[in-house]
Structures are given as structure tokens and as C-alpha cells.
């Protein structure tokens, strides 16, 4: 597991600093998984423990929600010999536009990072509407908390991280006043994060 964290750090996919999460909460760390996807060999190495667990399961299809899950679904399929497909948004609704799931096919959702598991519910709905069976989620990084587990079981992850996050008014980093708050998704995020260390 520490090997996976080192892989993420080696390609700047694991950032430390002061971050504004999409939930509005603050965190001292952030996983920018697109940076891992730049390096196929590192991505393959990070996904190896997930693929090993996946081989033990009776799975037909690995489904990656666009955008974050596409590469991971493909890599898991490559390592396990399964079929990979992806869901995508059309008019802001998650759907299966380019592929088909056959009734009764056993599906696994492949995600980059799972924090609450809520976003995977859309993909689960798509799988079930197509007649497939959603067995659970696999991910590179599992950030779920015991007090707030994912609504869909996480069957395998490459790395389990217990990263605290805070309401803005309770954030100890803000109270310290030393690190600027980095807004996620900005083009300067990686550079700002490095400057704050």
C-alpha cells in the first residue's frame, strides 16, 4: 500500500497543502489522479493490487464513469482480461451512450478516488437500468470514513487513506494562516501546492 502512495507522490498525484474540496470542505491533502494517468507504467503498477483482488471475483464488465474512471477501467480490464466500458454525461445525465450491458452481466465500477461513493450511484443506476448487476466499486484511492461508508461496497482499492477534512470555520490550516487555500480544478493547483509546502 505504501508503494502506491509513493507512486502517486512520484507523479504529483498526491498533493499536500491547503485545499478546497468540491464539497466545500478543506483538506491538507488532495489526490489529483489525472497526473497518474500521464504515466502508463505507474498507472499499471498502482492498479496491480486492485487487479489481483478483482481476479478472485466473477466479473464480466468493468465500468468507468467518465472522465476519472475511464483509464482505470481500461487498465483493470487489461490486467484481468475483462471487458471495459464507460458511462458518460449527456445533457448532465449519466448514461451508457457508446456501449451495451447485457442483461445479467456482472459489473464492477472503476473509480479514481472514492470519498463518499455518492457519484458512483449514478453509474450503478445506469448498469441496473441496462439489466446488469452492480457488484461494487474498485478504486485507486479509498478516502471513505467508517462513520460515512460508501452506499455501494468497495471491493478493492490500491490505497486506503484516512485524510481529515474540515468545515471552513473549523479548519486548523486556516486558523494557522500560513498556507493559502488552493481551489481545486484550477490550472495553477499543482504549482500553488508546491509553493505552499
What are these regions (language model features)?
Residues 1-197:
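PRPP-associated nucleotide enzymes
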